[in-house]
Curated annotation (Swiss-Prot):
Transmembrane residue ranges: none
Record keywords: Isomerase, tRNA processing
One of the protein's GO biological processes: tRNA pseudouridine synthesis
Protein name per its UniProtKB record: tRNA pseudouridine synthase A
Active-site residues, record numbering mapped to chain: 57
HAMAP family: TruA
The family this protein is said to belong to: Belongs to the tRNA pseudouridine synthase TruA family.
Protein origin, superkingdom: Bacteria
EC annotation from Swiss-Prot or TrEMBL: 5.4.99.12
Catalytic activity, reaction form: uridine(38/39/40) in tRNA = pseudouridine(38/39/40) in tRNA
Any Pfam family the entry gives: PseudoU_synth_1
Amino acid sequence: MARLRLTIAYKGTDLHGWQVQEHATRPRPRTVQGVLEPIVSRMAGEQVRLHAAGRTDAGVHADGQVAHVDIPDHKLDVDWQKAINAQLPDDICILDVRRAADDFHARFDALGKRYTYRLWLTRRFIPPKLHGQVWATGPLDVYAMDRAARHLAGTHDFAAFQNQGTDVTSTVRTVHAIRRCPSGTLPAGALLTYGEPYTSWRCTGTHPDQPPATAGHPLAGIGLELVWSFEGDGFLKQMVRNMMGLLVAVGRGALAADDVPGIMATLDRSRAPATAPACGLTLSEVYYPPCDYPYAR
């Protein structure tokens, strides 16, 4: 048998997450694993199982999900990327297929992951191409959110940010970096990294959290998109969405940035704000050795 490593992208809007739901009543919910495995099994000539780096929830997207699968040696000459993509629906795509070491494991060999979360800072309307891919929050105090994010970065017990339904032995995780990034339509500049200086962009409106006043700006009078990036050695169940829910609560003024350490110290999920919607979250990248991941031990 030979092991393949697949890099996968998908739009999660109409998907019930990664993992096949074998015990669900028929018709089974549509999942990424449930779509891919029958295709790969037919091509391999036998039943196969895909193992992913992370089991994304229903509605969550991916630009860089990684999975491994074992196939017969005599199937190595197949153009797996082309052949799988020819059979996939429009919301799932294989970005890369390569042979991996026989002991490679998509989940256990990962050095870290990067998730991104997209916010849309108005509720007046969402451009059609962003439907199901952003959380429309309305205006936010992004500078208060910056201050709150400083408390989340680093090594902490994140029990207050873990939802039920997991069997992990430890809730201590390291968030290496939290970045407030420019989207493709925003000025460059915003960066917040744990332990490093950062800068923030400003809009040209009357208030830094309002849409730009410049008539030629592509978002003038409409709203702003903010993209937050979270890098860490691993994340608990819905941890990124729970951190994003906290940051938005701070941005709305429901909490102060200085409330964050106290909430974390309780280790109590009920003390933290509600989970952010799945629609804004994307698994953007999974890091493996050898690579230039700056936080690798």
